[in-house]
Curated annotation (Swiss-Prot):
Species per Swiss-Prot/TrEMBL record: Coxiella burnetii (strain RSA 493 / Nine Mile phase I)
Pfam families tied to this protein: SecB
Superkingdom in the source lineage: Bacteria
PANTHER family: PROTEIN-EXPORT PROTEIN SECB (PTHR36918:SF1), PTHR36918
InterPro entries per record: SecB, SecB-like_sf
Subcellular location: Cytoplasm
Molecular function, one GO term: unfolded protein binding
GO CC terms of this entry: cytoplasm
Entry function: One of the proteins required for the normal export of preproteins out of the cell cytoplasm. It is a molecular chaperone that binds to a subset of precursor proteins, maintaining them in a translocation-competent state. It also specifically binds to its receptor SecA.
Keywords: Chaperone, Cytoplasm, Protein transport, Translocation, Transport
GO terms (BP aspect): protein folding; protein tetramerization; protein transport
Protein name, as recorded: Protein-export protein SecB
Subunit structure: Homotetramer, a dimer of dimers. One homotetramer interacts with 1 SecA dimer.
């Protein structure tokens, strides 16, 4: 009965969004200066890089992979590198075409980031280093910035898709 009520309350052509699966696709931690680095005063410099990749899986299913790479250096020496590729399979159905890019480029990475951040933090602690607190990321602003840079490059032949 509940299924029938749910079906009748949602029009067949209305927008649908569902998380099908969240998973770690790749995980890597390198600490080339262990254990010597543990004897030094801890004054790290952190750099974080983000990237997203979208794969169309057909039937309104999309894989979004968020790659978070954290590199920590001290006195220009590489201390550790932690990287995670956090994946998700999302069903995105009946959304207007102009809303698909923001859904895949911003909304889905917003869902994936807390999982990636937790994986990075866990690796760093297990590597013997102090816990990292990675700041929240405004994927909406990053997506908008990316879209504007693509518009600015639309007249050049070196455009990257």
């Amino acid at each position: 009965m509940a299924e029938q009520n749910q079906r009748t309350n949602t029009p067949d052509n209305g927008p649908e969004f569902a998380i099908q699966r969240l998973y770690i696709k790749d995980l890597s931690f390198e600490a080339p200066r262990s254990p010597q680095v543990f004897l030094e005063e801890w004054q790290p410099e952190l750099n974080m890089d983000l990237a997203t990749k979208v794969n169309d899986l057909g039937e309104d299913n999309h894989e979004v992979v968020l790659t978070v790479t954290v590199t920590v250096t001290m006195k220009e020496s590489h201390i550790f590198l932690a990287e995670v590729q956090q994946g998700g399979i999302f069903t995105i159905k009946n959304f207007p075409k102009e809303e698909m890019r923001p859904m895949l480029g911003s909304f889905c990475p917003n869902i994936l980031y807390p999982y990636a951040r937790e994986a990075i933090t866990d690796m760093v602690v297990r590597g013997g280093f102090p816990q990292l607190y990675l700041a929240p990321v405004n994927f909406d602003a990053l997506f908008e910035q990316h879209e504007q840079s693509e518009e600015g490059n639309s007249g050049t032949e070196d455009r990257v898709h």
